[in-house]
Amino acid sequence: MSLLSMLFGNKPKTAHLAKERLQLIIAHERDGGGSSANFLPDLQRELIAVISKYVKVNTEDIRVSLEKQGNYEVLEVNIVLPEKG
């Protein structure tokens, strides 16, 4: 490995790195109650409002989903940020 490769190496692209950092996954153990998916539209609207204060994003660039995996519910929030340019 050359000195230049060690110094500059292969760095991940900024958009890909931002996507990885902004993928937020929250899991909680299901308590057997009713479905909690009815809060997703409100959550998505509030996320858009908060994120829009700091970054200009399209509403289509924010995805909120809830999946059941065994005894857990996984809430996934994906936010695609615009490229700096």
From Swiss-Prot:
Example GO biological process: regulation of division septum assembly
Keyword RNA-binding: no
Keyword vocabulary terms for this entry: Cell cycle, Cell division
One Pfam family cited in the UniProt record for this chain: MinE
Source superkingdom: Bacteria
Family: Belongs to the MinE family.
Entry protein name: Cell division topological specificity factor
Function in brief: Prevents the cell division inhibition by proteins MinC and MinD at internal division sites while permitting inhibition at polar sites. This ensures cell division at the proper site by restricting the formation of a division septum at the midpoint of the long axis of the cell.
Gene3D superfamilies membership: Cell division topological specificity factor MinE
Presence of keyword Chloroplast: no
SUPFAM superfamilies with a match to the protein in the record: Cell division protein MinE topological specificity domain
